[in-house]
Amino acid sequence: EGTGLKIFNANAATLLRSMEMGCAGYSGVMANFHPDLYVWLCKNYKEQPEKAQELMNFLGAASMVECQVYPVNSKYHMNLVGVPMTLQSRRQDYKLLTGSKKLEIEEFCAITETFRKSFFGK
């Protein structure tokens, strides 16, 4: 306190709890998958705590996709949502994103959209 220093959490599963304890926001890789959900949480968790917890339940479970073949899976996801890019990465061999892992990302994309519609009422 008393400085301009702000702490941002990069762990999606602990985000809500850390913001309740004073963290300034989120700066994690899962924002590559659904940034709008993190924006909503950071802006609204104080005024709508029950809804924030509902969202956090989804985000915490969704964060497990990070353990798959990140960042290749994120690049694949970006292609699915209309942002074209190669799957090549310095960190992971894109060949590790097998057909079944691609299917998991496709299903993850679909369930995220289902959650988004339910959560925002669209």
Name each model feature, range by range:
Residues E1-Y70:
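Catalytic alpha/beta core domains of metabolic enzymes, predominantly
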